[in-house]
Amino acid sequence: MMWIQKNPFLGLLLCSFLAFFQSTYAEVGKLVCFYDAQSFVREGPAQMSLAELEPALQFCNFLVYGYAGIDAVTYKIKSLDPSLTNDRQHYRHITALRKKYPHVRFLLSVGGDRDVNSEGVADSDKYLRLLEQSEHRKSFQASVLAELNNNGFDGIDLAWQFPKNRPKLQQGVFKRVWGSLRGWFSSSSVDEKSEEHREQFATLLEELQSDLRRGGQLLTVSMLPHVSAELFIDVPKVLSNVDFVNLGTYDFQTPERDPKVADLPTPLYAMYDRDPSHNVQYQVQYWMNQTSEISVHKLHVGVTSYGRAWNMTRNSGITGYPPIPAANGAAPPGRQTVTPGLLSWPEICDLLQQQPQDREVPHLRKVGDPTKRFGIYAYRAADDQGENGLWVGYEDPLTAAIKAGFVHAQGLGGVAFHDLSMDDFRGQCAGEKFPILRSIKFKL
């Protein structure tokens, strides 16, 4: 290395480059694992104990505990299940796992559409009110610091409950494109003060980041599906004040939003004659276009471990090829999730393995995606009485790995995995625990 001694400037330049390369490289290939704490108190096969959670932690860089909420009067962070988090000390039981898994950072997430009003609907109003007043933000910030320190969390994740875009009817591609463009310039349909809230959210992050940095704690943001980044997120300011952002690149179509049309819930690329924004690539590209190449490693792509399911009717046809017309809302709940229109990976795997002669649960026909661009689905056409029809679009280990490969190819930070409790955490399908999580990790 005599040339370094002769030219110290080049040596300094090389050291700077290596430091940049190492810091950037260290930030890619991350796996953010979301943990629905309600899985701990569910009954039956959906219940996931801490012992069943632990095998996943060897693959996770971050564990995000979901979810806390906000008090509508004091604007302080609050538990959404005090009997679990306080009486049973569940927060501390989770963060105590750090002793066995020191490589994992434990975050507490706020919002996530779990903070609901008296009607059981995600409450966005108080999240906007908190942003609007400086004293409300200060109350929230102080309570966050106390909650993290009291329970041993390494940081806070803001899955902020902004108003969601309204569902759009299926229509031709020209109308889809025009509707999307028109939506960029009009915010009155979901929030007349979106510009103010956009700036106020950036201010909240700047203030909160300043407090958290003193204690070496993390600040992250999780975008929820159907929340418009164009309306509510100042991308450069947000990325400059957070450690990373988990993109809501899933649930583009759901039975709740689109009860009459079944379609692939999470295509990787744009599909013909669909909303051009309803795919992973579009969402990622929007964020990449708004920031510098240096900050791209802060973006994590959301990947799920479940499927969205609709009832097929006689008028839905027999081919199963999406989009499926004349669907009849959410399919019946599974034995594990017990939620209409939502099936976990082990529930889907079980349905796929049923034999045709099984009268209780007739088998589904799986249709793959040789293009590796849009996703897979399985279906059962309605019978002569118009009953027992089912259509489900979902992720499996292979499609999740394809998305992880996309993340790697784009130079993004990693994957945000939703949710550990929906993966096959008992290995009941193929004998391997957390197969989707594993497939993502190995591809990253």
From Swiss-Prot:
The miscellaneous annotation reads:
Lacks the typical Glu active site in position 161 that is replaced by a Gln residue, preventing the hydrolase activity. Its precise function remains unclear.
Q: Which PROSITE patterns match?
A: GH18_2 (PS51910)
Q: Where is the GH18 domain?
A: 29-444
> Could you confirm whether the keyword Metal-binding appears in this record?
no
Is the Signal keyword given for this protein? yes
Gene3D superfamilies documented for this protein = 3.10.50.10, Glycosidases
* Keywords of the record: Developmental protein, Disulfide bond, Glycoprotein, Secreted, Signal
Glycosylated residues are N289, N311
Question: Which InterPro entries does the entry link to?
Answer: Chitinase_II/V-like_cat, Chitinase_insertion_sf, Glyco_hydro18_cat, Glycoside_hydrolase_SF, Glycosyl_Hydrlase_18, IDGF
Recorded GO molecular functions are: chitin binding; imaginal disc growth factor receptor binding
Q: Which organism was this protein described from?
A: Drosophila melanogaster
Q: What does this protein do?
A: Probably required to stimulate the proliferation, polarization and motility of imaginal disk cells. May act by stabilizing the binding of insulin-like peptides to its receptor through a simultaneous interaction with both molecules to form a multiprotein signaling complex.
Q: What is this protein called?
A: Chitinase-like protein Idgf5
GO cellular component annotations, sorted alphabetically? extracellular region
Q: What taxonomic ancestry is recorded?
A: Eukaryota, Metazoa, Ecdysozoa, Arthropoda, Hexapoda
Disulfide-linked positions: C33-C60, C349-C429
Name its cellular compartments: Secreted
- Post-translational modification note: Glycosylated.
Signal peptide bounds: 1-26
**GO terms for biological process?**
carbohydrate metabolic process; chitin catabolic process; chitin-based cuticle development; imaginal disc development; wound healing
Q: Which family does it belong to?
A: Belongs to the glycosyl hydrolase 18 family. IDGF subfamily.
